[in-house]
Structure formats: structure tokens, C-alpha cells
Amino acid sequence: MGFAGGHSGRDRSRTVTLLDDTITFLEMLERPTGRRVPVPLDKLALLQAEHCTVSFYRYLYNTVGEPWLWFERRLIGDSELAALIHQPTIEIFVLYVRGVPAGFFELDTAAPRETKLCYFGLVPDFIGRRLGPHLLQAAIDRAWSSRLIERLWLHTSTFDHPNALRVYQQAGFVVYARRQVSFADPRERGILPRSLTHRPLPPLD
């Protein structure tokens, strides 16, 4: 998850490749009461990263988000990033498997009576182990139990994991809007590796 906003290329004399993206907005208006997701592995731990260091946050954001074209927070300096993630309304939780960071989620509780799931994802090495639904359930539980809210929402991108939308809907989120956007390909600008490609992300070369 992570909305890749449009940015112009550094060299304005060159033709900038634009990527077309569909941003899908989903919401949950009450806490789910259905069947719980079973714990997929043993030796799991979910810990809140209180006053998370910038270096550790960058590791999580870059490692989890690179395959899915997360790049906005790569563009900002350490002091600006620290100011963002150290706001009292931001909560960051990290999933560990046998002591190794396997994924994270970030909640924004700034708005009254609603919470935004800003970022959510797994380290690539841990994809395919049924950890995604388990971590999402933990994020939902935290959002609904930490304070009184009437809405939990998020948005996902065309370039997110191909199962992302389905997983969100299975967890109880409902689509309420879509928006078409275009943005300069961050691989051309050196923000992400040029070799990065997956469906529907076309190769550069």
C-alpha cells in the first residue's frame, strides 16, 4: 500500500515516462465480528516501535515497499521524516518471525473518530507464508481497540501486491472510491532500481 504521487523528472529536457495508476479507496465502518485468522507460524511477535529511529523506519519502508513502487518517503530528509513518524498520532507496529522483522503497519489516528491505515506490508522474504492476513487482522484490531472510532480506511494502488485488494476485502473493507492518477516513473529518476519490474509494471529496458 502507498499512494505514489506524481513528481516531475529531474532533467526537464528529457521525456519523462508517466505511469498510470488506479488508487482504490476502501473503508470499514464497524469492527469485524467474523472468524479470526489463524496464526500461521510459531514464534511470532508484534511489537510497537515506540519513537522509531529513522534508520529502522527507512529499512522497513524501503524493504517492504520497493517491489510495490513506494518512493515518496525516500524523497524527504531525515529531519522531515522524523517529524512525520514521531507525531503522537502515528503508531508503527512491527511483526517479527523468530526475531527477524517480517513486516509492519502504520496507523494515523489524527482525525477524530477515524483511523487511517497508512502503510502495511511484508518484507519480501516473508511473502507467501500466510502472514499478510494475520498482520492485517492485527492492524484492524489495534485500530478498533485503541480508541473509539467509527471508520478505518486505506487506499491501495495498481502497483501493490496483486492480492492486496482481495485481502483487504476479505478482511471486511469495502471499496468506496477510485481515482486515476499519473506520475513520473521513479526508476528513471534513480529513486528505485531500473531493474524493478512486475505485473503491471513494465520493464524500462
Predicted features by range, described:
Residues 127, 154-164, 181-191:
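Conserved beta-strand-loop-alpha-helix junction that forms the acyl-donor binding cleft
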Residues 143-156:
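Conserved GNAT acetyl-CoA-binding A-motif
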Residues 1-50:
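Acyl-donor-binding surface of acyltransferase catalytic domains
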Residues 75-79, 85-124:
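A conserved beta-strand-loop-helix scaffold within acyl/acetyltransferase catalytic domains
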Residues 38-72, 194:
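Short amphipathic alpha-helix that is part of the acyltransferase structural core
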Residues 91, 150, 174:
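Short acidic/polar active-site loop segments enriched in Thr and Asp
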Residues 18-21, 182-205:
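Acidic/histidine-enriched, glycine/proline-rich intrinsically disordered or flexible terminal extensions
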Residues 122, 128-143, 165-170:
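Conserved acetyl-CoA-binding loop-helix of GNAT-fold acetyltransferases
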